[in-house]
Amino acid sequence: SKWIRKYDKDLSLILTVSPLERKSFLGEDYNYSPEIIQTLGFPRFDNLENNNLKKQILIMPSWREYLQKSEFALKNSKYFKGLNDLLNNEELIGYAKDKGYKIIFKPHPNLANFIHLFDLDKNIIVDDKNTYQELFNESKLLITDYSSVAFDFSYLKKPVIYYQYSDDYNFDLSKSYFDYKTMGFGEVIKKDDDLIKLIKDYLDNDCEMKEVYKKRVDEFYKYNDQNNSKRVYDWIYEN
């Protein structure tokens, strides 16, 4: 994110979860010295655990900043139409119901301001009460597009689907180090028919993360434990 560049913030410590992420911060876009950027893990990850698992599918798309000021522009965008169609997909809703799954829609805070524009099926639960971590811990399957919530969810080794039907997402910097197709923790899907088929496959297999993606999780995160806060505390104390 460009807002943490040195001449904007001049931070004393930047935390990363992966050596690859750390390497990306060492580029010229940020201008920090290497000792400032540490791969210690995120303290918030310590609260992630697969407890109180429920049969629920979590839908959490990213936001499009350029649609912020106009309801008309939002409602007529490919981004909105694709999401609205998903939230009204009769095949998905019916299959989830048959399998005993609830579908939870957790809109981005900015998108929540426009929730009245959606034609929401009565079986879709719009969550405005639970924290992100509560939903991550409880849910069995995540559907997002480009959102960083996939990192939190994949830390638990639960399946992620990147539904990237709209290619209008604006990355903060010109090129991200993270390639969704080769590094992502789940399938990258463009078409709604393919998405529904894949979701049904996951529900048929109790939402078990596939081995190829478990391997990617293991390769990406330097640590997969609940000692992130301790590592950060120790580093601050020693420095």
Per-region residue spans from a language model:
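Active-site and donor-binding regions of nucleotide-sugar-utilizing enzymes
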Residues: 1-47
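Acidic, amphipathic alpha-helical patches
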Residues: 4, 92, 132
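Short, solvent-exposed loop/turn segments at secondary-structure junctions
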Residues: 19-22, 43-45, 62-66, 109-112, ...
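Catalytic binding pocket for nucleotide-activated donors in carbohydrate/polymer assembly enzymes
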Residues: 32-33, 119, 148-220
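Conserved catalytic-core segment of nucleotide-activated headgroup transferases in glycan assembly
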Residues: 38-116, 189-191
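Donor nucleotide-activated moiety binding/catalytic core segment of transferases
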Residues: 109-151
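C-terminal alpha-helical cap of glycosyltransferases
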Residues: 225-239
